[in-house]
Amino acid sequence: MATIKEIQQRLELVTDLADPFLAEAANDQRSGVQKAIEKRKRAIQAELDEDLRLEQMLRYEKELYKADYQAIAGIDEVGRGPLAGPVVAAAVILPPECKIKGLNDSKKIPKKKHQEIYQAVLDKALAVGVGLMNNEIIDQVNIYEATKLAMKEALSKLSLKPDYLLIDAMKLDVDIPQESIIKGDANSLSIAAASIVAKVTRDKLMADYDKKFPGYDFAKNAGYGTRSHLQGLERSGVTPIHRKTFEPIKSMYE
């Protein structure tokens, strides 16, 4: 009779719930074997669920490939709401049928997974572009217009010219066919890829600013108006990266 460890090792090779070995192993009544079977079944089901989720997130891209578009760029931004720092946009062109496990709206990805998924996007993407508009531009033109400028800059930095754009809840005045998708980062894999690139890029910038302007907790709050950030403003005042048209900073200048 095989040991429990040997059966566990064999189960690790099973990738299909219909694999005959699962039924065969189920005849072994040892609790260690039964637990190992259930664990492996859960893992296989999780893989199937993840593949289905990713397949759903490719539905926009697949329709466009059918319409003979070849280079589809997903575009998203991070940083519209913070009191400090830039708004960062990214544009990403993924190859057809590209599925990156765990890729989702960056707000739904655990922080400990950000770097890993960001790197997977960089490794698999056909092209990646990043655009940034600092707080001074945000104050000059407003955050909505600055976001569009950042997206257009990200688009201009792609090494491959896209023939279609999928954009998260935004329209751009560029001469490329496009679709604006509400909650696009949760519904399109290309937009989700842009979301994580923009998120990791901006978080790194804010961590660097935290060293330059200590006392505001930028590395943790990314410039959002958390208690520690507001306490820093009360204690030390406004830094050169704060948005002067955003409250409560605006009132400090009146």
UniProtKB/Swiss-Prot annotation:
It comes from the Bacteria. Keywords: Cytoplasm, Endonuclease, Hydrolase, Manganese, Metal-binding, Nuclease. Residues 70-254 form the RNase H type-2 domain. PROSITE patterns: RNASE_H_2 (PS51975). GO terms for molecular function: manganese ion binding; RNA binding; RNA-DNA hybrid ribonuclease activity. GO terms for cellular component: cytoplasm; ribonuclease H2 complex. InterPro entries: RNase_HII, RNase_HII/HIII, RNase_HII/HIII_dom, RNaseH-like_sf, RNaseH_sf. Its EC number is 3.1.26.4. It is found in: Cytoplasm. It catalyses: Endonucleolytic cleavage to 5'-phosphomonoester. GO terms for biological process: DNA replication, removal of RNA primer; mismatch repair. A divalent metal cation binds at residues 76-77, 168. Manganese or magnesium. Binds 1 divalent metal ion per monomer in the absence of substrate. May bind a second metal ion after substrate binding. Its cofactor is Mn(2+); Mg(2+). The keyword Hydrolase applies. It is an enzyme of class 3 (hydrolase). Belongs to the RNase HII family. PANTHER family: RIBONUCLEASE H2 SUBUNIT A, RIBONUCLEASE HII. HAMAP family: RNase_HII_B. Endonuclease that specifically degrades the RNA of RNA-DNA hybrids. This is Ribonuclease HII. It comes from Streptococcus sanguinis (strain SK36).
